[in-house]
Every structure is written in C-alpha cells, then in structure tokens.
C-alpha cells in the first residue's frame, strides 16, 4: 500500500499496477472498466465462467472462492497490488493470510470479516462505533425466535446471521409468521444461519446508502469524503430503485455523515463503503455496511462526473490517487453533477442466454440509458441490468428510470418474452 500516488504503469507490462477482483458481477465489472481506463491490469475471479467482470478483464479464473487453496493458487500466480472482494462468499481465513504475507486486501480483512456477519457488525456498530441502531436480539432455536420476536415486538425483521440481498430474511407481522421466518433463514441464506438476528421495525421515511470513501489526501493522511446520500427502496429485501440525492433534511444529512464517519473509522482501511441507514425526519439509524461499492450506488454512473462514480472513487482510493472534495461544516463532501435515479431490470424466469427487446423505444427516451450486465444465466429475481436516468428534478429522474425499465422485455432460450411491469409495489407510475 502506498500513500498518494503520482505514477501509474501500463497493463500487461512489467510496470503494471494489478488488481484482483474476488467476485465478478456487475459491480466488479464497473470497477474493471474504471481500471481499464487508467491502464491498470485486471484479473477477475468467480464461481462461473464469463461472469460480467471477466468480460472486461485481462485474465480470469473460475473456482470456488470458499476454497482457500484455490485462492492462494491465484494470488501466488498473479501477485496483485490489491485484492478487491466484490461478494460475501469468500474464504475469510485466506484474506487474513494474504494480509499477513504483505498483500493489500481492500479495505482490509477485518472489515470484510465484520461486515459479512450480522452479529459481529451489529456489536461493532453499537459497542465500538457507538451509533444508533434498531433494537435487536439473537435466536438459535425456534423457541428462542418466538421469545425474541415477542420481546422486540411486532412487526419485526428476522435475518440469517450471514447472508445478503434479502436472502434468508423475513418481515414478521405476528407469531403466525415465525415458522416461515425460521424456514426462510435456514433454507435461503447465502451463508451461515446457525443464528438469526431479530431487529425492531423502524417506520422510516426513506432508506439511504452513504457511499463514504476513505482515501489519502494531498498530505498523505487518510480522510473520508462523502458523496450526497443515495435514497433507495427494496422489494422482498433486494434493491429495486435508487436515486441521488436522497430527499432528507439538512440535519439528517449531517447525521448521516457523522454516523458513516464513525463506522468507517472503526472498520478502517482504504476504499468505498456502502453504509445503509434508515431516516425518519431528523433521526437516523445505522443498519448494515458493505465494505465495497453498493448496488444502490450504481446511480452515481449518472449523477457523478465521469471517472468519479462509486466505482471510480473506490479504485482511486485503492490506487492512492487523489479524490477532490470540499470541506463544509467539518465534513469533506464530493459534489454531484446532476440528480439521477436507477431502476433494475430483473428476470422473472429461469434459463440461459437472456435476450432483451424494447430497446429501440427505451433508448429513444432522452436523459436515460441502460446498462445490461452480460450475465449468461437468468433466474427469478436475478438482476440482469439497470436503467439510469437524470434530470434537474430527482422526482422526474425516478419516474423516467421506472418508465424506461418497464419498456424492456426479456426472454431466455427456454422461456417466452415477459415485461418488467409485472412488479408494481412502491412504484411511482
């Protein structure tokens, strides 16, 4: 790890700076594209061939990232300057071993270890960062789950202790939902479900993500820069639409920066963190943290200047390149270019070789564009693309993104065409 960098080499030569992506989805693809623009060599790893980031990397490897020996074989061969986890399903022991051997793990192995485990994260938020969260309890048996839900109160949320994207989570309205919540955690979690966290339901106005980025300043000191908070909503626990700026009060915005600063200072390291929070009026509660670019932050592909999306900011922090900002009331802020919004394009069916139509109409809409991720396989709920829209009025950007997304139809080799307008919950149009 260096401090502020003044030089870069050339990819595929002996002067190259090299990054290794552990996970090669749509977020990794955008990191790889930003790296390519700076002549940085990119190596992408995932469990399946032709994952999105692999399509724009210099080299790729397919294997089980829970297998420590596989990860070591790649690292020893490539000797990257930075190892960038993009997903949760990675052997954590390997990350600590890489650091011990002198490799730079982004942001650091400990932050990744904490963030992917809800109990470790919640205890870190409450006891070390000392930031407000919803009330919570843990359960390891069905009887304990009944007891915890009664004490927290209904409605409440149950979540597998290790998972992501809403998998293994359930909104519990009353005791009759608890058996289903237990089954959901035990069968749908993307990681361990040996324990379940029960969280108080916060009746929030908006859910936001703060994309706080820790990086070196011109004096070689680590500072934190804050883009405008990103508003978003989820459907069935998974991101469906986002927009920037979030429509919150000035007081709440300052509290968002304060909470994000306390959390990222505790986690440490370099890079961008997606800090999820609930906002109601002027009150803010911390929820979860992603130690990497965040799904909802794809809106910055439209709202931020070229090269400074959340992916560009993450890469600059990793490489030790400068990030502009302005100090306002004690916080270093990154300026937006224009209000913008996203809306997902999701599969409703399973199958291979997805095809999309409706593009002639969708791509004719002014102030909007589409990103198709290039995933070779579809299944219900899988995110295959996103619409970006921008406008001086963020409400208009939100409507435009939604409208364009619903123009797209999708099919696979084994299914018929289906439109995106099958989902209407929380929509504006």
Curated annotation (Swiss-Prot):
SS bond list: none
EC number of this enzyme: 6.3.1.21
Annotated residues for binding of ATP: 118, 159, 199-202, 207
Encoding gene (name): purT
Binding, Mg(2+): 276, 288
Pathway assigned to this chain's UniProt record: Purine metabolism; IMP biosynthesis via de novo pathway; N(2)-formyl-N(1)-(5-phospho-D-ribosyl)glycinamide from N(1)-(5-phospho-D-ribosyl)glycinamide (formate route): step 1/1
Keywords: ATP-binding, Ligase, Magnesium, Metal-binding, Nucleotide-binding, Purine biosynthesis
GO BP term, example: 'de novo' IMP biosynthetic process
Name this polypeptide is given: Formate-dependent phosphoribosylglycinamide formyltransferase
Role according to the record: Involved in the de novo purine biosynthesis. Catalyzes the transfer of formate to 5-phospho-ribosyl-glycinamide (GAR), producing 5-phospho-ribosyl-N-formylglycinamide (FGAR). Formate is provided by PurU via hydrolysis of 10-formyl-tetrahydrofolate.
GO molecular-function terms, A-Z: ATP binding; magnesium ion binding; phosphoribosylglycinamide formyltransferase 2 activity; phosphoribosylglycinamide formyltransferase activity
Family assignment from sequence similarity: Belongs to the PurK/PurT family.
GO terms for cellular component: cytosol
NCBIfam families named among the record's database cross-references: PRK09288.1, purT
Binding positions for N(1)-(5-phospho-beta-D-ribosyl)glycinamide per the UniProt entry: 26-27, 86, 295, 375, 382-383
InterPro entries assigned: ATP-grasp, ATP-grasp_carboxylate-amine, ATP_grasp_subdomain_1, PreATP-grasp_dom_sf, PurT, PurT/PurK_preATP-grasp, PurT_C, Rudment_hybrid_motif
Domain ATP-grasp positions: 123-319
Catalysed reaction, written as an equation: N(1)-(5-phospho-beta-D-ribosyl)glycinamide + formate + ATP = N(2)-formyl-N(1)-(5-phospho-beta-D-ribosyl)glycinamide + ADP + phosphate + H(+)
Oligomeric and partner information: Homodimer.
SUPFAM superfamilies: Glutathione synthetase ATP-binding domain-like, PreATP-grasp domain, Rudiment single hybrid motif
Broadest EC class assigned to this enzyme: ligase
PROSITE patterns: ATP_GRASP
Pfam families per UniProt: ATP-grasp, PurT_C, RS_preATP-grasp-like
